[in-house]
């Protein structure tokens, strides 16, 4: 089995650029399609051969309403084993700009827990309403 996730946001082009920059991802040209208005119908963002996240334009205007009704998102993107503190710091610098909720306002920290024990990381809800949990 292979699982993957897609986020629906207003501003799919900007969101995809943000995630590409934060996590050093590249779009899969075979898994990229555009809407008539030039926004993404779908774009798979890859780290090597692994899809990390797909992005699509929220054409139904549901996303912000769902966020407004829920205090926290019902799902989080967990990116672990990012490798270095520098990679985590870079992801934080990019994703924390205009974050809606920043659970780590002082930046990445240790201890930050995952299934393997203490790591260096952060948690936040980005400007598009996507929750990220990222660590070394």
Question: Which residues make up each language-model segment?
Answer:
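Vicinal oxygen chelate
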Residues: 1-10, 17-127, 134-136
């Amino acid at each position: 089995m292979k699982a993957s996730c897609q986020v629906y946001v207003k501003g799919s082009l900007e969101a995809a650029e943000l995630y590409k920059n934060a996590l050093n991802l590249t779009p899969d040209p075979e898994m990229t399609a555009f809407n008539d208005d030039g926004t993404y119908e779908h774009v798979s963002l890859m780290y090597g051969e692994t899809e990390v996240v797909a992005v699509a334009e929220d054409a139904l205007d549901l996303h912000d309403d769902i966020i407004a009704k829920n205090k926290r998102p019902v799902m989080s993107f967990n990116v672990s084993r990012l490798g270095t503190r520098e990679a985590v710091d870079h992801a934080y610098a990019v994703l924390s700009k205009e974050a809606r909720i920043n659970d780590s306002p002082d930046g990445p920290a240790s201890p930050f827990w995952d299934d393997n024990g203490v790591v260096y990381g952060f948690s936040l809800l980005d400007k598009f309403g996507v929750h990220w949990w990222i660590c070394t």
